Curated annotation (Swiss-Prot):
It is found in: Cytoplasm. Residues 149-199 are annotated as: Domain III. Keywords: Cytoplasm, DNA damage, DNA recombination, DNA repair, DNA-binding. Residues 144-148 are annotated as: Flexible linker. This is Holliday junction branch migration complex subunit RuvA. Homotetramer. Forms an RuvA(8)-RuvB(12)-Holliday junction (HJ) complex. HJ DNA is sandwiched between 2 RuvA tetramers; dsDNA enters through RuvA and exits via RuvB. An RuvB hexamer assembles on each DNA strand where it exits the tetramer. Each RuvB hexamer is contacted by two RuvA subunits (via domain III) on 2 adjacent RuvB subunits; this complex drives branch migration. In the full resolvosome a probable DNA-RuvA(4)-RuvB(12)-RuvC(2) complex forms which resolves the HJ. It comes from Citrifermentans bemidjiense (strain ATCC BAA-1014 / DSM 16622 / JCM 12645 / Bem). InterPro entries: DNA_helicase_Holl-junc_RuvA_I, Hlx-hairpin-Hlx_DNA-bd_motif, NA-bd_OB-fold, RuvA, RuvA_2-like, RuvA_C, RuvA_C_sf. GO terms for biological process: DNA recombination; DNA repair. The gene is ruvA. The lineage of its organism: Bacteria, Pseudomonadati, Thermodesulfobacteriota, Desulfuromonadia, Geobacterales. Residues 65-143 are annotated as: Domain II.
Amino acid sequence: MIALLTGKLAYKSPEFIILDVNGVGYQVHIPFSTYYTLPVEGGALSLQIHTSVKEDAINLYGFRTQQEKELFQLLIGVSGVGPKLATGILSNSEPSELADSLVNGNLARLSAIPGIGKKTAERLVLELKEKMKKLGLAQPQAGGTTAPAKQEIRDDVLSALINLGYKEAVVQKALAELKVTEDATVELVLKQALKILMK
């Protein structure tokens, strides 16, 4: 069971990265909370890993901190929440914000996340409220990144949000409200788009 990987960041996208560990490339799925903190491609990187084993596949999920990993594992421990949905939940809320929503029973905020209905939100609060109080969560730190072209940024954000469960037309509308500046990054535009979508 893989629990930690350390190597060189060979490729990154909002959905997954490829981590080069001594010449072997590992594809690791990540939430936005981890993506925001990644170094530039070629940089050194160490990720906490959760290994998901199924009959037909072995998937790796990576996190910059042990706390994020623990939160992910708490989420998938809730009935009806698999690794993909748990990653989506973390992608829509920073760990500290998610913890606050669970502790305070903010069902409206939780239900606004794609893939989570009212019943799932209620189940999350019921099962995780007390556990969240015991789990200290730090704000993710911003990581360095280069500034790609505006259209490339929009395309990456569009793809990432569609993969999270948002309708393309809804995402396009949100992106239309944003002004992508010359120094904009995928991380920044993702955060801004999510704020609009979560209204």
